[in-house]
């Protein structure tokens, strides 16, 4: 592993103003493991209060503090959580320049290119055309099939085979989890007819969190792509079960991408109750697979 990506809100007590003791421990860990701090994943809790959303000034002020913290941690990039409003970009540019900090919105399955706030961000990104404003691509938008670990988790909680079969067929036909909805926003008849229990409905609402976009959606965005999350649901002997990383790495190589790709393991959330979690084994296998693919592609 060459670098590390962290979520300070979850992993560093007191964020965005951790104690000196916490910062000293961070410095010690970085020195001890010899790993480069790469990117901080930051959130913007616009719904922090019950009775109102944050003002534009409050949003910008919070992100300024996140930029300062990421700089202190030795990073030069922050990931903006999906749906971050585009209005924060221009006011933050002077701070990005001061701290040499890139900002990159995460394009995440379920919140990707078809969402208006994502479209607004991309439009503002292109308007400003700054080397400090870009994107993080989450490869959950490139699922060739639904994660099997999610299906098995739902089965363990009582989901029947019929709803799962409907969604699997959608993928076979070139669709994805979003295809379970009709134009009216309701479940398509084929799925609605087989939802017979609470566990079936639970599965259906999980199913829309994965997309099956073509890699060509990135063609005109490559100059703005700063970082990529290589989503990991389940490693098999032949690679990741849902995502074709050989194909993705070849695409990135052919388009001269030179940023990091980061293993992001999410199979742990689908661990069946009573079964051991295999996060270390899964991440190690994924990292090895990525390196093997790169050796083959790069020669």
Q: What kind of feature is each model-predicted range?
A:
Residues 1-10, 69-76:
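Catalytic domains of carbohydrate-active enzymes, especially glycoside hydrolases
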Residues 5-29:
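Glycine-rich, proline-tolerant flexible connector loops at the mouths of alpha/beta enzymes
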Residues 29-32, 36, 46-183:
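Active-site acidic/histidine proton-transfer and metal-coordination neighborhood
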Residues 274-298:
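C-terminal helical cap(s) of enzyme catalytic domains, especially alpha/beta-barrels
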């Amino acid at each position: 592993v060459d670098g590390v990506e962290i979520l300070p809100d979850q992993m560093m007590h007191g964020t965005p103003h951790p104690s000196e003791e916490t910062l000293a421990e961070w410095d010690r860990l970085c020195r001890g493991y010899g790993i480069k701090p790469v990117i901080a994943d930051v959130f913007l809790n616009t719904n922090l209060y019950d009775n109102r959303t944050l003002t534009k000034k409050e949003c910008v002020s919070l992100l300024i503090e996140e930029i300062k913290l990421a700089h202190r941690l030795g990073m030069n990039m922050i990931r903006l959580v999906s749906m971050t409003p585009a209005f924060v970009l221009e006011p933050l540019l002077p701070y990005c320049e001061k701290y040499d900090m890139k900002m990159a919105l995460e394009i995440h399955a379920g919140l990707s290119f078809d969402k208006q706030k994502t479209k607004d961000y991309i439009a503002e990104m292109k308007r400003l055309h700054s080397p400090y404003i870009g994107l993080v691509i989450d490869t959950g938008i490139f699922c060739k099939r639904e994660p099997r670990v999610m299906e098995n988790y739902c089965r363990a909680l009582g989901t029947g085979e019929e709803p799962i079969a409907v969604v699997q067929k959608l993928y076979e036909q070139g669709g994805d989890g979003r295809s379970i909805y009709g134009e009216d926003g309701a479940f398509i008849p084929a799925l609605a007819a087989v939802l017979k229990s609470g566990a079936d409905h639970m599965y259906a609402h999980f199913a829309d969190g994965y997309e099956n976009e073509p890699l060509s959606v990135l063609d005109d965005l490559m100059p703005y792509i700063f970082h990529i999350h290589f989503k990991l649901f389940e490693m098999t002997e032949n690679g990741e079960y849902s995502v074709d990383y050989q194909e993705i790495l070849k695409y990135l190589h052919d388009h001269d991408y030179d940023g990091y790709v980061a293993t992001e393991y999410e199979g742990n959330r689908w661990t069946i109750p009573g079964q051991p979690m295999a996060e270390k084994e899964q991440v190690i296998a994924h990292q090895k697979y990525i390196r093997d693919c790169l050796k083959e592609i790069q020669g």
